[in-house]
Amino acid sequence: MKLPIFIADAFTARAFRGNPAAVCLLENELDEDMHQKIAREMNLSETAFIRKLHPTDNFAQSSCFGLRWFTPASEVPLCGHATLASAAVLFHKIKNMNSTLTFVTLSGELRARRAEDGIVLDLPLYPAHPQDFHEVEDLIKTAIGNTLVQDICYSPDTQKLLVRLSDVYNRSFLENLKVNTENLLQVENTGKVKGLILTLKGEPGGQTQAFDFYSRYFAPWVGVAEDPVTGSAHAVLSSYWSQHLGKKEMHAFQCSHRGGELGISLRPDGRVDIRGGAAVVLEGTLTA
């Protein structure tokens, strides 16, 4: 078996920043267990598998493909950064001729289109509802100790818990916050939570560039201790911060050690456009 495989850094214009994802091009269907084996071998937060939907399809000319995402531990229903990476590989390396690509996924049809300053993903917008603190107190205390919390919401569609830190904190605090992910699996084992979002209101005019909000994302439940930049989390964050800031256009920064920027535009049809750059840093052949 020989498969073309790439690694692309998503939500960045520069290599070695943003969130790396492996992208594998499938001419034919793979055995089910082989997807997971390859993802485990790549050992990145996600590996994307792009497959042809029809035998006559062509990676350079067709505009619609199947797309699946796997962490080293399991398949996931949505991954924004690996979708961006997949589009970058098709646009920039395979030289796909189309301006918009459609991916058929577990989360429905997702579209990626070329833009002057990167690639725009058309993603579902997921609401987050108020969450009772006492139900998740052990999880929050385990993760961040006595850090002051301003708001807690839960997204049932994505199984993500959103924890907004107090406005007394700044970006530097969030970047340096030590988060205990090792014990989260023990305190939350009901299956309700699959991801923890920590977020903070932005500082207009602060630190070289103004951002509307900051975040970090942790998902040990699917084998990812901390994800560098997370498109799917921003499908939840966009809904939350749009309501609290009264804005449809936002600029966000995810404060992982690699860091990544995301442009956000809420659409009239109830979806969200998330914009980012991507840099393809590796291409080769997987042999097994």
Curated annotation (Swiss-Prot):
The keyword Transmembrane does not apply. It comes from the Eukaryota. Its EC number is 5.1.-.-. Pfam families: PhzC-PhzF. Interacts with UNRIP/MAWD. Belongs to the PhzF family. This is Phenazine biosynthesis-like domain-containing protein. It comes from Homo sapiens (Human).
